[in-house]
Structures are given as structure tokens and as C-alpha cells.
Amino acid sequence: MYPENYKRFLELIDKLREFEGALIVEGLRDEVALRNLGVRAEIIRLSRLPLSEVALIASSHKEVMILTDFDKKGEELAKKLLNYLAGYPCSVDIETWKELRKLVRKDIKGVEDLYGLYLRVVSVSDPLLEGIQ
């Protein structure tokens, strides 16, 4: 990731921390990484349930954020989830995933790697980034 993107990356991490809806991820390691980042929202893992059931559980929240991995498989899962969630009255955030993917996909492949990338960014951050954590 280019240094000029560090600030936006950290802002997106803060957005994840502050999110109060349901976050949909692929697996346990993704959930662990998000918890390490300080995310407190309910996390629903795709590895445990069929997509239709995940969508039903997630739809009980007003807001749902899709946070699949940043590879081709993750992109396909995100599209399928959007289709499943389209029939429910919840608000679905896919834009955060798209922006994160654009920023990090050359550095990492999955959500499970976000915490490690976060630690690297914070360790090399300059004074302009102080206060954003």
C-alpha cells in the first residue's frame, strides 16, 4: 500500500470498529483479525452456514456489512450475498469492502490479514497520522 493511502486505510479500520450492525465474513480467522482490530459488531461467518441462512440471520439487523476476502472467490461470495440480502429490508454496505479491497489487494488477499497490515501501517505512520487509530 502506498503511504498516501495509510490515512484512509486507518479511517476504514475505525469505521469497522464503530459499525454496530452485522458483519459477514468468510471464516474464523477473519473474525479473529477483526476482534484484534477492536471490532465489536456481531460477526457472522459464512463457513458455518448456507448463504440463505446467513442472509436471514443478518437481515435481523438494520445494517449489514459484507466483508469477504479480497480475491475472486470473495468477490463472488459478496455478489451472491448481495442477491440474497436484496429481499430483506436491511441496509447493506458493500462500499467499505470495495474501498478496502482497492487499497489493500496488492498487499493482502483476505480479511484475516487486515490486522497484520494495520500493525505495519501504524508502525511506519508519520506525524500526519497521529490521532487516527
Curated annotation (Swiss-Prot):
Q: Which family does it belong to?
A: Belongs to the UPF0292 family.
Q: Which residues bind Mg(2+) 2?
A: D69, D71
**Cofactor(s) needed by this chain:** Mg(2+)
Residues in domain Toprim?
A: 20-100
Binding residues annotated for Mg(2+) 1, in chain numbering: E26, D69
Q: How is the cofactor bound?
A: Binds two Mg(2+) per subunit.
Which protein are we looking at? UPF0292 protein TK1411
Query: Would the keyword Metal-binding be found if you checked this record's keyword annotation?
Result: yes
Keywords for the protein's UniProt record, in alphabetical order? Magnesium, Metal-binding
Enumerate the Pfam families for this protein. Answer: Toprim
| SMART domains hit by this protein | TOPRIM
> What GO annotations for molecular function exist for this entry?
metal ion binding
Q: Which domain of life is it from?
A: Archaea
